[in-house]
Amino acid sequence: MKTIYLKCFLAVFAAAALFAGCSKNAETDSNPDPTPPAPPTPAYKVGDLYTKGFVKGIVVSVDETGEHGLLVSLNQCEEVWSYKVEEAMGSLPGSGAYNTSCVQKLHDWKEYYPAFVEATKDNVGALKNWFLPSMNELAKLYSAYTGHETNDTEGGTGSLNSIRSPKTGPETASASSEEQQRKDFFNKCLTDNGGDAMEDKVYWSSSENGPSIVFAFDMGTGKSIDTPSDLDKRARHMVRAMASF
């Protein structure tokens, strides 16, 4: 009798173990595969092509991670800053995005501010990615274009001057050659992607300096313009949009 009870107990125990194992397998099999990890955010460097959504341009500067920075548009044109004598920013300009937003709040800006119309023409719908750069942002574009830094860029306004180490004799020619190589490299990044090459000309900033004058930057000399007639809002200078990413 004891043998029969023992056999029955073992049979019941084996059945219970088998059922538990099947339930566990079924539970395990019902779980979906784990979600694959998201791809890492790409790290950019100066000269890279950035393209995401409706934004496409060449990287001008990046932060320490390489994930965020500034880029410049592929195209440029020559245009008047404004046909109106007024202070769109109250002579307190900030970043290019802020300055551009101040102009866009004016009900007639599309009629009287052609430089801003050109700078924002690639914005789609309510998106406001592109803007006319401030002096500080133009300084970063100049650095990407020539390899030289500028001073006095705090706050995005003021007089800018290229910082070049003083060189004489053969060193001068070498420095000039290095700068030209840098320009060729950056322009190739633009033209290889269907864009317009940068030029050693005066470029408008969005940094207003009064009712009738605006800061502008000479990409050839690396200096801000100080001739009043060249700073008149009705003068024609190069316009090149920038965007943050």
Please annotate each region the language model reported:
Residues 34-130, 201-203, 213, 232-242:
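Extracellular adhesion/carbohydrate-recognition regions
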